[in-house]
Amino acid sequence: MTKSTYVELGEEKTSNQKGNMKRGVSILDFILRLIAIVATLASAIAMGTTDESLPFFTQFVRFRANYDDLPTLRFFVVASAIVSGYLILSLPLSILHIIRSSAGMTRVIFIILDTVMLGLLTAGSSAAASIVYLAHKGNRKANWFAFCQQYNSFCERISGSLIGSFIAIPLFIMLILLSALVLSRR
């Protein structure tokens, strides 16, 4: 009689440990989504509010640098905003996974949508990084001159806004791997 009691307790602990593991992964998923929201939203806001004006000869003639002048920086802002919106909309499902760890179909949806958002964020960040590099270094062969010496504040802000998006990229990779881990343990 005692042997069967031990076996039953052992089975309960194993299934309970599996449930605790899924719950822990779901909590980590939620935290990573919150961090990614902050990173992508801060990147979009920092880039979207970047502009600088420089006087030329007099106060009345000014040269202006704005993120909107370059289509790739516009794409970066739109991509980061879309990813932020997706992450905000995915929070209720992430909370559902904490409460009910057996929701497997939404994990598959998360893997697919997280992968799409990872691609979008990577494309926007890479495109913006190439323009930021050209702004800092220029390209002599194409007669593109580096303008960061003149527009120092503008260049610092657009460079800084890339940091958040490049933080969010590994977070998305971790989110995809966590969802795959939970599905494989199912």
From Swiss-Prot:
Summary of subunit composition and partner proteins: Homodimer and heterodimers.
Q: How does the protein associate with the membrane? A: Multi-pass membrane protein
Q: Which residues lie on this side of the membrane: Cytoplasmic?
A: 1-26, 96-107, 183-186
What is one Pfam family matched by this protein? CASP_dom
One record GO biological process = cell wall modification
User: What does this protein do, in the record's words?
Assistant: Regulates membrane-cell wall junctions and localized cell wall deposition. Required for establishment of the Casparian strip membrane domain (CSD) and the subsequent formation of Casparian strips, a cell wall modification of the root endodermis that determines an apoplastic barrier between the intraorganismal apoplasm and the extraorganismal apoplasm and prevents lateral diffusion.
Gene Ontology annotations for the cellular component aspect, listed alphabetically? plasma membrane
What's the name of the protein? Casparian strip membrane protein 3
Residues spanning the membrane = 27-47, 75-95, 108-128, 162-182
